[in-house]
Amino acid sequence: MKKIPSIGVVSLGCPKATVDSERILTQLRAEGYLLVGDYANADVVVVNTCGFIDAAVEESLEAIGEALDENGKVVVTGCLGAREGGDFVRGAHPKVLAVTGPNQAGAVLDAIHAALPPAHDPYTDLVPPQGLRLTPPHYAYLKISEGCNQSCSFCIIPSMRGKLVSRAPDDILREAEALVAGGAKELLVISQDTGAYGVDRKYRTAFHNGRPLKTRITDLCAALGELGVWVRLHYVYPYPHIDELLPLMAEGKILPYLDVPLQHGSPRILKAMRRPAAAEKTLDRILGWRQAVPDLIIRSTFIVGFPGETDADFAELLDFLRAAELDRVGCFAYSAVEGAPANAIAGAVPEPVKEERRAAFMAVQEAISRQRLQRRVGQRQRVLVDAMARGGRVIARSASDAPEIDGVVHLGKAAGLQVGDWVEVAITRADAHDLYGMVVSA
Protein backbone atom coordinates (compact mmCIF):
# COMPACT_ATOMS: atom_id res chain seq x y z
CA MET A 1 0.00 0.00 0.00
CA LYS A 2 1.37 3.37 -0.99
CA LYS A 3 2.29 5.56 1.97
CA ILE A 4 0.25 8.76 2.28
CA PRO A 5 2.60 11.79 2.29
CA SER A 6 2.48 13.54 5.67
CA ILE A 7 3.04 17.14 6.73
CA GLY A 8 3.74 18.68 10.13
CA VAL A 9 3.05 22.35 10.80
CA VAL A 10 4.50 24.69 13.45
CA SER A 11 2.53 27.95 13.53
CA LEU A 12 3.96 30.91 15.45
CA GLY A 13 2.98 34.56 15.80
CA CYS A 14 -0.27 36.47 15.65
CA PRO A 15 -3.81 35.40 14.66
CA LYS A 16 -3.16 36.64 11.11
CA ALA A 17 -0.41 34.03 10.85
CA THR A 18 -2.77 31.43 12.30
CA VAL A 19 -5.21 32.12 9.48
CA ASP A 20 -2.40 31.79 6.92
CA SER A 21 -1.51 28.40 8.44
CA GLU A 22 -5.13 27.28 8.34
CA ARG A 23 -5.35 28.09 4.63
CA ILE A 24 -2.18 26.12 3.93
CA LEU A 25 -3.46 23.17 5.97
CA THR A 26 -6.82 23.22 4.22
CA GLN A 27 -5.24 23.07 0.77
CA LEU A 28 -2.78 20.37 1.79
CA ARG A 29 -5.58 18.21 3.15
CA ALA A 30 -7.62 18.78 0.00
CA GLU A 31 -4.64 17.48 -1.99
CA GLY A 32 -4.54 14.29 0.05
CA TYR A 33 -1.70 14.99 2.46
CA LEU A 34 -1.90 13.54 5.96
CA LEU A 35 -1.46 16.14 8.71
CA VAL A 36 0.54 14.97 11.73
CA GLY A 37 1.44 16.53 15.05
CA ASP A 38 5.01 15.32 15.52
CA TYR A 39 8.32 15.53 13.71
CA ALA A 40 8.92 11.77 13.59
CA ASN A 41 5.89 10.99 11.43
CA ALA A 42 6.15 14.02 9.13
CA ASP A 43 7.78 13.78 5.71
CA VAL A 44 8.07 17.59 5.56
CA VAL A 45 7.61 20.25 8.26
CA VAL A 46 6.25 23.74 7.57
CA VAL A 47 7.28 26.46 10.05
CA ASN A 48 5.17 29.63 9.90
CA THR A 49 7.32 32.30 11.52
CA CYS A 50 6.97 35.68 13.22
CA GLY A 51 9.54 38.44 12.77
CA PHE A 52 8.01 41.43 14.53
CA ILE A 53 10.26 41.77 17.59
CA ASP A 54 13.59 40.26 18.60
CA ALA A 55 12.01 37.69 20.92
CA ALA A 56 9.75 36.50 18.09
CA VAL A 57 12.71 36.27 15.69
CA GLU A 58 14.63 34.19 18.22
CA GLU A 59 11.65 31.91 18.82
CA SER A 60 11.17 31.43 15.07
CA LEU A 61 14.84 30.63 14.43
CA GLU A 62 14.82 28.15 17.31
CA ALA A 63 11.69 26.48 15.92
CA ILE A 64 13.29 26.17 12.48
CA GLY A 65 16.44 24.72 14.03
CA GLU A 66 14.47 22.22 16.08
CA ALA A 67 12.48 21.11 13.03
CA LEU A 68 15.70 20.65 11.05
CA ASP A 69 17.31 18.65 13.88
CA GLU A 70 14.27 16.44 14.46
CA ASN A 71 13.09 16.04 10.86
CA GLY A 72 15.48 17.56 8.34
CA LYS A 73 13.02 18.66 5.66
CA VAL A 74 11.67 22.12 6.46
CA VAL A 75 9.76 24.77 4.50
CA VAL A 76 9.76 28.21 6.12
CA THR A 77 7.03 30.81 5.62
CA GLY A 78 5.67 33.87 7.44
CA CYS A 79 6.95 37.31 8.31
CA LEU A 80 10.51 36.31 9.18
CA GLY A 81 10.74 34.62 5.80
CA ALA A 82 10.24 37.99 4.11
CA ARG A 83 13.26 39.56 5.78
CA GLU A 84 16.07 40.22 3.29
CA GLY A 85 14.14 38.30 0.65
CA GLY A 86 14.58 35.07 2.59
CA ASP A 87 18.34 35.43 2.97
CA PHE A 88 18.05 36.14 6.71
CA VAL A 89 16.56 32.71 7.36
CA ARG A 90 18.83 30.97 4.86
CA GLY A 91 21.85 32.58 6.52
CA ALA A 92 20.88 31.10 9.87
CA HIS A 93 19.60 27.78 8.50
CA PRO A 94 20.98 27.07 5.01
CA LYS A 95 19.51 23.55 4.92
CA VAL A 96 15.86 24.62 4.72
CA LEU A 97 14.07 23.49 1.57
CA ALA A 98 12.45 26.85 0.81
CA VAL A 99 11.68 30.24 2.34
CA THR A 100 8.59 32.34 1.59
CA GLY A 101 6.98 35.42 3.10
CA PRO A 102 3.55 35.80 4.71
CA ASN A 103 0.30 35.25 2.83
CA GLN A 104 2.09 33.14 0.21
CA ALA A 105 0.24 29.84 0.44
CA GLY A 106 0.85 29.15 -3.25
CA ALA A 107 4.62 29.37 -2.87
CA VAL A 108 4.51 27.13 0.21
CA LEU A 109 2.49 24.53 -1.67
CA ASP A 110 4.88 24.69 -4.63
CA ALA A 111 7.80 23.99 -2.29
CA ILE A 112 5.98 21.07 -0.69
CA HIS A 113 4.99 19.64 -4.08
CA ALA A 114 8.63 19.77 -5.18
CA ALA A 115 9.84 17.93 -2.09
CA LEU A 116 6.84 15.66 -1.57
CA PRO A 117 4.36 15.17 -4.44
CA PRO A 118 0.73 14.72 -3.35
CA ALA A 119 -1.11 11.41 -3.52
CA HIS A 120 -4.63 12.69 -4.05
CA ASP A 121 -7.64 10.38 -4.02
CA PRO A 122 -10.37 12.18 -6.01
CA TYR A 123 -13.07 9.92 -4.55
CA THR A 124 -12.49 10.93 -0.93
CA ASP A 125 -13.86 14.13 0.61
CA LEU A 126 -10.93 15.20 2.78
CA VAL A 127 -11.85 18.76 3.75
CA PRO A 128 -14.93 20.05 5.57
CA PRO A 129 -16.65 23.09 4.01
CA GLN A 130 -15.25 25.44 6.68
CA GLY A 131 -11.68 24.33 5.95
CA LEU A 132 -9.13 23.13 8.49
CA ARG A 133 -8.50 25.25 11.56
CA LEU A 134 -5.95 25.48 14.34
CA THR A 135 -8.44 26.97 16.81
CA PRO A 136 -11.03 24.96 18.79
CA PRO A 137 -14.30 24.35 16.91
CA HIS A 138 -16.30 26.92 18.89
CA TYR A 139 -14.40 30.00 17.71
CA ALA A 140 -12.55 31.08 14.59
CA TYR A 141 -10.46 33.97 13.32
CA LEU A 142 -11.85 35.76 10.28
CA LYS A 143 -9.19 37.74 8.41
CA ILE A 144 -10.75 40.54 6.36
CA SER A 145 -7.66 42.14 4.83
CA GLU A 146 -3.94 41.77 4.40
CA GLY A 147 -1.23 44.41 4.86
CA CYS A 148 -1.31 47.94 6.22
CA ASN A 149 -1.11 51.52 4.91
CA GLN A 150 0.23 52.97 8.18
CA SER A 151 3.91 53.83 8.59
CA CYS A 152 4.46 53.48 12.34
CA SER A 153 8.13 54.05 13.08
CA PHE A 154 8.51 50.98 15.32
CA CYS A 155 6.90 48.52 12.89
CA ILE A 156 8.06 46.66 9.79
CA ILE A 157 4.82 44.79 9.10
CA PRO A 158 4.05 46.79 5.89
CA SER A 159 7.43 45.77 4.49
CA MET A 160 6.61 42.14 5.25
CA ARG A 161 2.89 41.97 4.43
CA GLY A 162 2.60 44.88 2.00
CA LYS A 163 0.01 47.62 1.66
CA LEU A 164 -3.64 47.18 2.60
CA VAL A 165 -5.50 44.67 0.44
CA SER A 166 -9.12 44.17 1.54
CA ARG A 167 -10.99 40.97 0.77
CA ALA A 168 -14.29 41.24 -1.08
CA PRO A 169 -17.14 41.35 1.47
CA ASP A 170 -19.09 38.56 -0.23
CA ASP A 171 -16.02 36.33 -0.01
CA ILE A 172 -15.68 37.11 3.71
CA LEU A 173 -19.35 36.37 4.35
CA ARG A 174 -19.19 33.04 2.53
CA GLU A 175 -16.28 32.05 4.75
CA ALA A 176 -18.08 33.30 7.87
CA GLU A 177 -21.20 31.31 6.99
CA ALA A 178 -19.12 28.17 6.47
CA LEU A 179 -17.38 28.68 9.82
CA VAL A 180 -20.70 29.08 11.62
CA ALA A 181 -22.13 26.04 9.85
CA GLY A 182 -19.05 24.14 11.04
CA GLY A 183 -19.75 24.95 14.68
CA ALA A 184 -18.11 28.33 15.32
CA LYS A 185 -20.04 30.36 17.88
CA GLU A 186 -17.63 33.28 17.88
CA LEU A 187 -15.94 35.06 14.97
CA LEU A 188 -12.88 37.14 15.79
CA VAL A 189 -12.45 39.72 13.03
CA ILE A 190 -8.77 40.43 12.43
CA SER A 191 -6.44 42.30 10.08
CA GLN A 192 -3.54 44.70 10.49
CA ASP A 193 -5.92 47.69 10.47
CA THR A 194 -9.53 46.56 10.76
CA GLY A 195 -11.06 50.04 10.66
CA ALA A 196 -9.39 50.75 7.31
CA TYR A 197 -11.18 47.84 5.65
CA GLY A 198 -12.32 48.80 2.15
CA VAL A 199 -10.19 51.92 1.70
CA ASP A 200 -8.15 50.27 -1.05
CA ARG A 201 -11.34 49.15 -2.83
CA LYS A 202 -12.85 52.64 -2.54
CA TYR A 203 -15.75 51.07 -0.62
CA ARG A 204 -17.15 49.58 -3.83
CA THR A 205 -20.41 47.66 -3.66
CA ALA A 206 -20.46 43.88 -3.93
CA PHE A 207 -23.41 41.49 -3.74
CA HIS A 208 -24.08 38.63 -1.35
CA ASN A 209 -27.16 36.43 -1.74
CA GLY A 210 -28.56 39.05 -4.11
CA ARG A 211 -28.18 41.91 -1.62
CA PRO A 212 -25.85 44.88 -2.15
CA LEU A 213 -23.01 45.13 0.35
CA LYS A 214 -20.44 47.92 0.51
CA THR A 215 -16.82 47.17 1.24
CA ARG A 216 -16.91 49.10 4.54
CA ILE A 217 -16.33 47.87 8.07
CA THR A 218 -19.76 49.07 9.25
CA ASP A 219 -21.61 47.28 6.45
CA LEU A 220 -19.53 44.14 6.87
CA CYS A 221 -20.17 44.05 10.64
CA ALA A 222 -23.90 44.57 10.10
CA ALA A 223 -23.95 41.54 7.79
CA LEU A 224 -21.83 39.43 10.16
CA GLY A 225 -24.18 40.43 12.97
CA GLU A 226 -27.00 38.57 11.24
CA LEU A 227 -25.27 35.20 11.66
CA GLY A 228 -26.35 34.76 15.28
CA VAL A 229 -22.87 34.37 16.78
CA TRP A 230 -20.49 36.56 18.75
CA VAL A 231 -18.62 38.96 16.45
CA ARG A 232 -15.53 40.45 18.10
CA LEU A 233 -13.37 43.19 16.52
CA HIS A 234 -9.60 43.32 16.88
CA TYR A 235 -6.91 45.82 15.79
CA VAL A 236 -9.24 48.80 15.42
CA TYR A 237 -7.63 52.24 15.21
CA PRO A 238 -9.80 54.97 16.81
CA TYR A 239 -10.88 56.51 13.51
CA PRO A 240 -13.95 58.80 13.63
CA HIS A 241 -16.03 56.39 11.54
CA ILE A 242 -15.66 53.70 14.22
CA ASP A 243 -18.48 55.59 15.96
CA GLU A 244 -20.78 54.06 13.32
CA LEU A 245 -20.24 50.64 14.93
CA LEU A 246 -21.72 51.71 18.26
CA PRO A 247 -25.39 51.23 17.24
CA LEU A 248 -24.56 47.67 16.14
CA MET A 249 -23.11 47.03 19.60
CA ALA A 250 -26.07 48.63 21.36
CA GLU A 251 -28.44 46.43 19.33
CA GLY A 252 -26.49 43.27 20.15
CA LYS A 253 -25.46 42.67 16.53
CA ILE A 254 -21.76 42.64 17.39
CA LEU A 255 -20.06 42.40 20.77
CA PRO A 256 -19.50 45.64 22.72
CA TYR A 257 -15.76 45.03 22.53
CA LEU A 258 -12.99 46.92 20.76
CA ASP A 259 -9.33 45.98 20.63
CA VAL A 260 -7.68 49.37 20.00
CA PRO A 261 -3.84 49.39 19.78
CA LEU A 262 -3.14 52.81 21.33
CA GLN A 263 0.60 52.30 22.07
CA HIS A 264 1.13 55.46 24.17
CA GLY A 265 -0.50 58.43 25.87
CA SER A 266 2.12 61.13 25.32
CA PRO A 267 1.43 63.28 22.22
CA ARG A 268 5.16 63.74 21.72
CA ILE A 269 5.88 60.01 21.73
CA LEU A 270 2.84 59.25 19.56
CA LYS A 271 4.20 61.70 17.00
CA ALA A 272 7.60 59.99 17.11
CA MET A 273 5.83 56.66 16.66
CA ARG A 274 3.93 58.09 13.65
CA ARG A 275 0.65 56.92 15.10
CA PRO A 276 -2.55 57.97 13.28
CA ALA A 277 -4.36 59.44 16.32
CA ALA A 278 -3.63 62.05 19.00
CA ALA A 279 -3.94 61.02 22.65
CA GLU A 280 -6.29 63.82 23.68
CA LYS A 281 -8.71 63.09 20.81
CA THR A 282 -8.53 59.38 21.57
CA LEU A 283 -9.46 59.94 25.21
CA ASP A 284 -12.45 62.06 24.18
CA ARG A 285 -13.50 59.35 21.73
CA ILE A 286 -13.24 56.62 24.39
CA LEU A 287 -15.39 58.64 26.79
CA GLY A 288 -17.90 59.21 24.00
CA TRP A 289 -17.99 55.52 23.14
CA ARG A 290 -18.73 54.62 26.74
CA GLN A 291 -21.54 57.15 26.94
CA ALA A 292 -23.15 55.57 23.87
CA VAL A 293 -22.47 51.96 24.94
CA PRO A 294 -21.98 51.75 28.73
CA ASP A 295 -21.08 48.04 28.58
CA LEU A 296 -18.29 48.60 26.04
CA ILE A 297 -15.08 46.70 26.79
CA ILE A 298 -11.87 48.25 25.48
CA ARG A 299 -8.60 46.36 25.29
CA SER A 300 -5.33 47.90 24.16
CA THR A 301 -1.58 47.47 24.00
CA PHE A 302 1.14 49.96 24.89
CA ILE A 303 4.88 50.33 24.46
CA VAL A 304 7.08 51.77 27.22
CA GLY A 305 10.71 52.77 26.83
CA PHE A 306 10.33 54.01 23.25
CA PRO A 307 13.45 55.95 22.15
CA GLY A 308 13.35 59.45 23.60
CA GLU A 309 10.69 58.61 26.20
CA THR A 310 11.34 60.80 29.26
CA ASP A 311 10.02 60.54 32.80
CA ALA A 312 7.51 63.25 31.85
CA ASP A 313 6.33 61.26 28.82
CA PHE A 314 5.88 58.18 30.97
CA ALA A 315 3.95 60.20 33.55
CA GLU A 316 1.64 61.38 30.75
CA LEU A 317 1.12 57.77 29.74
CA LEU A 318 0.09 56.82 33.28
CA ASP A 319 -2.25 59.81 33.45
CA PHE A 320 -3.85 58.68 30.19
CA LEU A 321 -4.20 55.15 31.51
CA ARG A 322 -5.94 56.33 34.67
CA ALA A 323 -8.28 58.62 32.73
CA ALA A 324 -9.18 56.03 30.08
CA GLU A 325 -9.82 53.19 32.56
CA LEU A 326 -9.29 50.54 29.92
CA ASP A 327 -10.58 47.06 30.69
CA ARG A 328 -7.83 44.87 29.27
CA VAL A 329 -4.29 46.04 28.62
CA GLY A 330 -1.00 44.56 27.50
CA CYS A 331 2.33 46.36 27.82
CA PHE A 332 5.66 45.71 26.15
CA ALA A 333 9.08 47.16 26.79
CA TYR A 334 10.31 48.64 23.51
CA SER A 335 12.44 46.28 21.47
CA ALA A 336 14.35 47.51 18.43
CA VAL A 337 13.18 45.79 15.26
CA GLU A 338 15.67 45.46 12.44
CA GLY A 339 14.69 47.80 9.62
CA ALA A 340 12.34 49.96 11.71
CA PRO A 341 12.77 53.77 11.40
CA ALA A 342 12.55 54.12 15.20
CA ASN A 343 16.03 52.66 15.46
CA ALA A 344 17.42 56.00 14.27
CA ILE A 345 15.67 58.02 16.99
CA ALA A 346 18.06 59.36 19.62
CA GLY A 347 17.64 58.77 23.33
CA ALA A 348 17.60 55.00 23.78
CA VAL A 349 16.07 54.11 27.13
CA PRO A 350 18.23 51.76 29.27
CA GLU A 351 16.83 48.25 29.66
CA PRO A 352 16.47 48.48 33.48
CA VAL A 353 14.45 51.69 33.08
CA LYS A 354 12.21 50.05 30.48
CA GLU A 355 11.46 47.19 32.84
CA GLU A 356 10.84 49.54 35.78
CA ARG A 357 8.36 51.51 33.68
CA ARG A 358 6.65 48.39 32.42
CA ALA A 359 6.22 47.11 35.97
CA ALA A 360 4.90 50.49 37.15
CA PHE A 361 2.51 50.65 34.19
CA MET A 362 1.12 47.17 34.86
CA ALA A 363 0.69 47.94 38.56
CA VAL A 364 -1.51 50.92 37.68
CA GLN A 365 -3.47 48.87 35.16
CA GLU A 366 -3.91 45.96 37.57
CA ALA A 367 -5.66 48.26 40.04
CA ILE A 368 -7.90 49.59 37.26
CA SER A 369 -8.71 46.09 36.02
CA ARG A 370 -9.50 44.85 39.53
CA GLN A 371 -11.86 47.77 40.11
CA ARG A 372 -13.67 47.35 36.78
CA LEU A 373 -14.08 43.60 37.21
CA GLN A 374 -15.37 44.06 40.75
CA ARG A 375 -18.32 45.99 39.31
CA ARG A 376 -19.53 42.82 37.63
CA VAL A 377 -19.91 40.86 40.86
CA GLY A 378 -23.60 40.12 41.34
CA GLN A 379 -24.38 40.30 37.62
CA ARG A 380 -25.74 37.49 35.49
CA GLN A 381 -23.87 36.89 32.25
CA ARG A 382 -24.13 34.58 29.29
CA VAL A 383 -20.79 32.88 28.81
CA LEU A 384 -19.23 30.45 26.35
CA VAL A 385 -17.58 27.32 27.75
CA ASP A 386 -13.98 27.50 26.58
CA ALA A 387 -12.18 24.59 28.22
CA MET A 388 -12.34 21.81 30.76
CA ALA A 389 -9.58 22.06 33.33
CA ARG A 390 -8.12 19.46 35.65
CA GLY A 391 -10.57 17.99 38.13
CA GLY A 392 -13.62 18.74 36.00
CA ARG A 393 -13.42 22.49 36.48
CA VAL A 394 -15.12 24.54 33.76
CA ILE A 395 -13.41 27.56 32.19
CA ALA A 396 -15.63 29.96 30.24
CA ARG A 397 -15.41 33.37 28.61
CA SER A 398 -17.82 36.27 28.72
CA ALA A 399 -18.46 38.74 25.92
CA SER A 400 -15.72 40.82 27.57
CA ASP A 401 -12.98 38.25 27.00
CA ALA A 402 -11.17 37.35 23.80
CA PRO A 403 -9.51 33.93 23.80
CA GLU A 404 -5.91 33.64 24.96
CA ILE A 405 -5.30 37.36 25.58
CA ASP A 406 -8.02 38.35 28.07
CA GLY A 407 -9.39 36.89 31.29
CA VAL A 408 -11.75 33.98 31.84
CA VAL A 409 -14.74 33.06 33.98
CA HIS A 410 -14.01 30.22 36.42
CA LEU A 411 -17.11 28.11 37.08
CA GLY A 412 -15.71 25.29 39.20
CA LYS A 413 -17.25 21.87 38.63
CA ALA A 414 -20.44 21.88 36.56
CA ALA A 415 -21.81 18.57 35.37
CA GLY A 416 -23.09 18.15 31.85
CA LEU A 417 -21.30 21.08 30.23
CA GLN A 418 -19.11 20.74 27.15
CA VAL A 419 -16.72 23.05 25.35
CA GLY A 420 -18.75 25.32 23.09
CA ASP A 421 -21.88 25.34 25.28
CA TRP A 422 -23.66 28.56 26.15
CA VAL A 423 -24.51 28.93 29.82
CA GLU A 424 -25.92 31.65 32.07
CA VAL A 425 -23.89 32.29 35.21
CA ALA A 426 -24.02 34.47 38.29
CA ILE A 427 -20.74 36.28 38.99
CA THR A 428 -19.76 35.73 42.63
CA ARG A 429 -16.31 37.31 42.87
CA ALA A 430 -13.46 38.84 40.88
CA ASP A 431 -9.72 39.39 41.05
CA ALA A 432 -7.46 41.60 38.94
CA HIS A 433 -7.80 39.44 35.83
CA ASP A 434 -10.62 36.90 36.05
CA LEU A 435 -14.21 36.44 37.16
CA TYR A 436 -15.63 33.58 39.23
CA GLY A 437 -19.19 32.38 39.05
CA MET A 438 -21.76 29.64 39.35
CA VAL A 439 -24.08 28.18 36.74
CA VAL A 440 -27.64 29.50 36.83
CA SER A 441 -28.98 27.75 33.74
CA ALA A 442 -27.50 25.89 30.81
UniProtKB/Swiss-Prot annotation:
All residue ranges annotated as the TRAM domain in the record: 374-441
GO BP term, example: tRNA modification
Every MTTase N-terminal domain range: 5-117
MF terms in GO: 4 iron, 4 sulfur cluster binding; aspartic acid methylthiotransferase activity; metal ion binding; protein methylthiotransferase activity
EC assignment: 2.8.4.4
Keywords: 4Fe-4S, Cytoplasm, Iron, Iron-sulfur, Metal-binding, S-adenosyl-L-methionine, Transferase
Note on how the cofactor is bound: Binds 2 [4Fe-4S] clusters. One cluster is coordinated with 3 cysteines and an exchangeable S-adenosyl-L-methionine.
Record domain Radical SAM core: where: 134-371
A Pfam family matched in the record: Radical_SAM
CDD domains for this protein: Radical_SAM
Binding site for [4Fe-4S] cluster 1: 14, 50, 79
One GO term describing the cellular component: cytosol
SMART domains: Elp3
Residues holding [4Fe-4S] cluster 2: 148, 152, 155
Superkingdom: Bacteria
Family designation: Belongs to the methylthiotransferase family. RimO subfamily.
PANTHER family found in the cross-reference section: RIBOSOMAL PROTEIN S12 METHYLTHIOTRANSFERASE RIMO (PTHR43837), RIBOSOMAL PROTEIN US12 METHYLTHIOTRANSFERASE RIMO (PTHR43837:SF1)
General function of this protein: Catalyzes the methylthiolation of an aspartic acid residue of ribosomal protein uS12.
Protein name as annotated: Ribosomal protein uS12 methylthiotransferase RimO
Species name: Acidithiobacillus ferrooxidans (strain ATCC 53993 / BNL-5-31) (Leptospirillum ferrooxidans (ATCC 53993))
